[in-house]
């Protein structure tokens, strides 16, 4: 006998249509890219506490001057959380983040997409008539949420775009392209640093510069490139 951690080796039943759904999503992305239409991957990153809370990781600091944090991570009700909602442009390998203050809702998710379109999308795709959104099956952009569908219809009415949504199969959100192309670089940028000022999050755009980013459209692909933040 020995002490051991729990190991998650099984993820439940493997539905026979899961692989077919991945292939369908991949073909949809390819079709939109060939037509010059925007295809984006969206999701909500882990909520971040604002204040001197411990954040795992290490970063370079002057010797003998570590950044001081609280002993206990008790949440301060007076300080809102940062809720980063990301939009990753598959064709241009660019990411954009909208940061909320309180709750991760369907209205917030669609508003983030609307702001991405107003800030970047309409300039990058002036002739676009269609928009493909790749998202996981749960959370604020879950396929069962009626508010998500209502807000998407409002987005389509406001922008004049035909909006197509492709949901990844349940339990496969780690294959969502934004996880590897955008959120992973944000996590590396934030590691070992307290998020003491919400202005560090506001309108935070991340550009992930990968040599394969322009061509790799598989939702299961990963990037080995680097990232630079731009204002």
Across the structure, where does each feature detected by a protein language model lie?
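Two-metal-ion acidic nuclease core segments, chiefly of the RNase H-like superfamily
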Residues: 148-164
């Amino acid at each position: 006998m020995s002490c051991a951690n729990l190991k998650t080796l099984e993820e439940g039943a493997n539905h026979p249509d899961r692989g077919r759904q991945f292939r369908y999503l991949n073909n949809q992305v390819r079709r939109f890219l060939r037509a010059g239409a925007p295809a984006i991957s969206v999701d909500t990153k882990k909520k971040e506490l604002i204040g001197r809370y411990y954040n795992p990781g290490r970063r370079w600091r002057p010797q003998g001057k570590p950044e001081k944090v609280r002993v206990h991570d008790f949440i301060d009700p007076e300080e809102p959380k940062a809720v980063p909602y990301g939009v990753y442009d598959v064709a241009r390998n660019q990411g954009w983040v909208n940061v909320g203050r309180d709750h991760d809702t369907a209205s917030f998710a669609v508003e983030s997409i609307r702001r991405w379109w107003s800030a970047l999308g309409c300039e990058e795709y002036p002739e676009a008539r269609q928009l493909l959104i790749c998202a996981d099956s749960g959370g604020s952009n879950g396929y069962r949420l009626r508010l998500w569908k209502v807000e998407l219809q409002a987005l389509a009415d406001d922008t004049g775009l035909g909006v197509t949504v492709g949901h990844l199969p349940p339990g496969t959100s780690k294959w969502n392209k934004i996880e590897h192309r955008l959120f992973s670089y944000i996590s590396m940028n934030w590691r070992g640093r307290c998020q003491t000022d919400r202005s560090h999050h506001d309108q935070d755009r991340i550009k992930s510069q990968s040599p394969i980013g322009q061509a790799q459209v598989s939702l299961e692909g990963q990037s080995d490139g680097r990232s630079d933040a731009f204002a």
